[in-house]
Amino acid sequence: MKLLKYPFIFLLFLALVNCGKYEEGPGFSLLPKATRLQQKWRPIQFVDASTSVITEIEKDGSYLEFVKGGSLQYYNHDLMSFIGVAAATGTWEFSSDKTQVTVYYELMGLSSTNTYTINKLKINSLALIDEDGDKTYYEYF
């Protein structure tokens, strides 16, 4: 009977420690948040906070890549293709409670710093909310 008690307590502990912090999930994951975030993401949908208009994003090569160690690559086809830039590089970091991610990148001498609230962080899907409340959904690239 004692042998059954310890695995149950361990599973309960895991469930409490890994409870979902993000509104759209996951509720539980054994993978650390950084591991789930550190991959290449393709934007698939944009939701405007002020109008609630949902815009599907075409597969045009745009991506956001969070690299292990805190580096970042960002490419927005609509903004960067006409100036011939392959990608913007920068850095990223979690907030202390890992509910937000701050990205910093430079493009043609101009720097940009944005903080996004993580709404969803699954192994194959991500949703970020910007400072204006606009939400962008991403899928694993």
Task: Tell what function each PLM region has.
Residues M1-P7:
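Bacterial N-terminal signal peptides that target proteins for export
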Residues A15-N18:
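C-terminal motif of bacterial Sec signal peptides marking the signal peptidase cleavage site
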Residues G20-F141:
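Lipid interaction determinants
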